[in-house]
Amino acid sequence: MDLTIPKDYDPRLSIRETEAAIRYIRETFQDEFGKELNLQRMSAPMFVEKSTGLNDNLNGVEQPVSFEMKDMPNETVEIVHSLAKWKRLALKRYGFGMHEGLYTNMNAIRKEEDLDNFHSIYVDQWDWEKIISKDERTEETLKDTVRDIFKVIKHMEHEVWYKFPQAVYHLPDEIHFVTTQELEDRWPDLTPLEREDKIAKELGAVFVMKIGDKLQRSGKPHDGRAPDYDDWSLNGDIIFWYEPLQRRIEVSSMGIRVSPESMKYQLEQADATDREKLPFHKMLLNGELPYTIGGGIGQSRLCMLLLGKAHIGEVQASIWPEDMIKKCEENHIQIL
């Protein structure tokens, strides 16, 4: 558990006012985001069968919450970590066409999450996926999509200011791009997270690109990424410098998805070639799935950012250690 207490914190909204603001942000953002990227909202599962290989393995070590169903006693069912792979399969199953996509209201449990101001075991995000052509699997496609998402987030600042002027947190006017290798070259003695703090404070809003593969100096990845959805050379995180906590806040992780060739390489790098036998991976390697770009946008994180909140527990209901709750109460942080 790690907790940062901002000095002289003022939540500015009551709990009931905060709830009204959360609803407004969620409803407004998803409509504008869907229109901007040409996405249709779709229903999505909260759990998947382990044998399908559809669950997100995250960094490869986190264990999902799992159970057995009475009517399917021989099948292990897992609560999703995210819908990263499910969405790509859904685009094929549901007959989406070129430059069409979907988004979902994704709820997940990550029971091994380290709790702090930004992290909860409960994850809520808009998970989205969109079909692109093979020729569009480029850095420029990725950057253009990041700019589109940033434009919607920036517009939400004005929407929130109009409804809740006393609470809105002001965002930078543009987003910048930097690779993880550039960060390591500039600050080789810092940790990846410290590098992100540095660049976010310097630039305000940044898309940190190319996460998952080994860096040249350290020989280690900037951060862990599953080998079977993002292409490690065409992905990244949208981060903002967050003044209330003097740290960067990550709002979205996204990327152009693996091709058959890049997934094969990444599975080898991750020592996970056994996944090639799973149904999803077989389809992908056989070229049966569309080329896509996709990601997730944290709903609670976005609400936290736009409202200037000190703790994610102010914008979502979850479970927290008693000593964390007590410290928050002592410092005017209103945990739901």
From Swiss-Prot:
Pfam families: AsnA. It catalyses: L-aspartate + NH4(+) + ATP = L-asparagine + AMP + diphosphate + H(+). It comes from the Bacteria. CDD domains: AsnA. GO terms for molecular function: aspartate-ammonia ligase activity; ATP binding; catalytic activity, acting on a protein; transferase activity. InterPro entries: aa-tRNA-synth_II (IPR006195), aa-tRNA-synth_II/BPL/LPL (IPR045864), AsnA (IPR004618). Gene3D superfamilies: Bira Bifunctional Protein, Domain 2 (3.30.930.10). It is found in: Cytoplasm. One of its GO terms (cellular component) is cytosol. Coiled coil: none annotated. Pathway: Amino-acid biosynthesis; L-asparagine biosynthesis; L-asparagine from L-aspartate (ammonia route): step 1/1. Keywords: Amino-acid biosynthesis, Asparagine biosynthesis, ATP-binding, Cytoplasm, Ligase, Nucleotide-binding. One of its GO terms (biological process) is L-asparagine biosynthetic process. Its EC number is 6.3.1.1. Belongs to the class-II aminoacyl-tRNA synthetase family. AsnA subfamily. NCBIfam families: asnA (TIGR00669). This is Aspartate--ammonia ligase. It comes from Limosilactobacillus reuteri (strain DSM 20016) (Lactobacillus reuteri).
